[in-house]
């Protein structure tokens, strides 16, 4: 339900904004006998849209936004959400999207990007995903510039390391709720997840145990059972990466895993909601994006 509503919002806003953008660019005054106007042209070539697994509405927005303003798009969806992306594509076709405007192309990211980024008609990149992947794409675009007809437009939204800073006189119960929901909804697999917190010792001494107690109550299981607050992370690669951070924290002299830390990949890729307390503001889990159910408190 949320994904459908958000995608509808994207499409409605984009249509409104495209009209506003066009109107605002028109000259305010034309001398008598002269007609001045500004025409906004689509890119000369195609846009490569690469969408993520964790945000269905963004997956629909990345290819449709450039198409709305006249561009041809090659849409490479995440390998972990082919079906939902396909459903969105079918909806656009049913709504009247002409053939060839958005070209749905599931497959290997490396193979598709290698072909697309070196094609002389490559004109733009619309991307949401990891910082490292975006940097790699940008570098390959730069290397391919001599082969391209124009300078590609590059638009990307990448990861982050969002934080919570608490005041010594904060609402401690409100802080517990904010950290729990901000860190562990969707297993922390979103760029807006609260993955680190800077808390006064006085605050942590009061509410730390309460936070751990609430986390211990979190229900985990099948995503089709809506009584579960958490489910599995997206795939084995994510499972291995996240558990690696947890295991290295357990072995560190400056970190303590105070709740969670367990995992099970016997059926699905389940990782317990985990809190790491550290005395080192530069600890690995304090500075690197984990993209999983791990909160580090300093």
Question: Residues of each region from the PLM?
Answer:
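Glycine-rich nucleotide-phosphate-binding loops and adjacent flexible coil segments
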Residues: 293
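Long amphipathic alpha-helix in the N-terminal Rossmann-like dinucleotide-binding domain
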Residues: 1-24, 34-35
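Glycine- and acidic
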Residues: 1, 71-75, 193-195
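Rossmann-like NAD(P) dinucleotide-binding subdomain of oxidoreductase/dehydrogenase enzymes
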Residues: 20-174
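ALDH superfamily catalytic-core signature
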Residues: 91, 96, 118-119, 124, ...
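Conserved beta-strand/loop elements of the cytosolic catalytic core of P-type E1-E2 ATPases, chiefly
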Residues: 297-298
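Short, solvent-exposed loop/beta-turn-alpha elements that line the ligand-binding surface or hinge
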Residues: 286
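Short coil/turn segments at secondary-structure boundaries
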Residues: 1-3, 21-29, 191-192, 223-227
């Amino acid at each position: 339900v949320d994904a459908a509503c958000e995608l509808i919002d994207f499409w409605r806003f984009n249509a409104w904004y495209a009209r506003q953008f066009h109107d605002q660019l028109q000259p305010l005054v034309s001398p008598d006998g002269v007609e001045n106007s500004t025409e906004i042209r689509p890119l000369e070539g195609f846009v490569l849209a690469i969408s993520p697994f964790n945000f269905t509405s963004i997956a629909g927005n990345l290819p449709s936004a450039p198409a709305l303003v006249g561009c041809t798009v090659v849409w490479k969806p995440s390998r972990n959400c082919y079906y939902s992306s396909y459903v969105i594509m079918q909806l656009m076709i049913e709504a009247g999207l002409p053939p060839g405007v958005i070209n749905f192309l599931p497959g290997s990211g490396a193979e598709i990007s290698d072909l697309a980024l070196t094609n002389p008609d490559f004109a733009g990149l619309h991307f949401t995903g990891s910082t490292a992947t975006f940097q790699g794409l940008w570098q390959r675009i730069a290397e391919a510039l001599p082969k391209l007809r124009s300078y590609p437009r590059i638009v990307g939204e990448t990861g982050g390391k969002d934080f919570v800073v608490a005041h010594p006189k904060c609402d401690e119960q409100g802080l517990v709720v904010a950290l729990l929901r901000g860190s562990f909804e969707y297993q922390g697999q979103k760029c807006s997840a609260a993955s680190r917190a800077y808390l006064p010792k006085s605050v942590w001494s009061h509410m730390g145990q309460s936070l751990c107690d609430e986390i211990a109550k979190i229900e985990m299981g099948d995503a089709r059972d809506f009584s579960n607050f958490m489910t599995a992370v997206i795939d084995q690669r994510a499972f291995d990466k996240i558990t690696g951070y947890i295991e290295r924290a357990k072995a560190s002299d400056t970190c303590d895993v105070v709740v969670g830390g367990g995992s099970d990949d016997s059926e699905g890729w389940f990782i317990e909601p985990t809190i790491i307390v550290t005395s080192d503001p530069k600890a690995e889990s304090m500075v690197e994006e984990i993209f999983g159910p791990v909160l580090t408190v300093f």
